[in-house]
A protein has these predicted regions:
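Short, acidic, metal-binding catalytic loop of nucleotide-sugar glycosyltransferases
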Residues: 22-31
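Short, structured coil segments at secondary-structure junctions
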Residues: 29, 50-52
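Active-site beta-to-alpha loop of glycosyltransferases that engages the nucleotide-sugar donor
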Residues: 8-21, 39
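A conserved acidic beta->alpha catalytic loop
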Residues: 37-45
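Short beta-strand-to-loop acidic/aromatic patch adjacent to the donor-nucleotide binding site
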Residues: 77-87
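Residue-level signature of catalytic and energy-coupling elements of molecular machines
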Residues: 17, 24, 70, 85, ...
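Cell-envelope/extracellular polymer assembly enzymes that use nucleotide-activated donors
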Residues: 3-5, 32
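Acceptor/aglycone-binding surface of glycosyltransferases and processive sugar-polymer synthases
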Residues: 59-61, 65-72, 78, 90-160
């Protein structure tokens, strides 16, 4: 997996980020990790001090900007957006990478196919996601079941 970078936006994630990094470490995933942190988030920066992560101080603002900065900084063949809050399960990274190596530009994970699931989905978020997913299928001809879930892996050049 040394051809994979996890891009991890982390704003005020000092509590959850160490748990996420431990989970990744326990799976012996040999991948690069870029953690994008705003300079004013001193607590998250502190928990990263002795980690094996590359720390990228975010120049702009917001989640989308953190993704752009992290993905533009990635140099491996593949990159994966990986949340710092523990909402993604790293055990699926090998399967996702295999699909990318089977010549898919992007692999999107989903909460709505077995054995997936979401503990924090309400009826309203489920309906909203269903609506937006349907809209994206119609407008962009996407074969996707969960457009609002950002556990995405792809060729770094395609992201950039």
């Amino acid at each position: 997996m040394n051809n994979l970078t996890l891009v991890i936006p982390a704003k005020f994630e000092a509590t959850t980020l160490p748990l996420v990094l431990k989970e990744i470490r326990e799976l012996n995933l040999n991948c690069k990790k870029i953690v994008v942190v705003p300079k004013y988030d001193e607590e998250t920066l502190k928990v990263l001090e002795n980690s094996d992560c590359e720390i990228l101080i975010q120049k702009g603002e917001g989640f989308g900007n953190a993704l752009i900065e992290g993905l533009n900084h990635s140099t491996t063949e593949y990159s994966c957006i990986f949340n710092a809050d523990g909402s993604f399960d790293p055990k699926y990274l090998n399967q996702m990478l295999k699909r990318n190596e089977d010549n898919f530009e992007f692999v999107f994970s989903t909460r709505y196919k077995k054995p997936g699931g979401s503990d924090d989905d309400t009826f309203l978020t489920f309906i909203g996601n269903y609506f937006f997913t349907f809209l994206c299928k119609v407008l962009f001809r996407l074969n996707i079941s969960d457009v609002l879930y950002t556990y995405v892996m792809g060729k770094t050049t395609a992201f950039q």
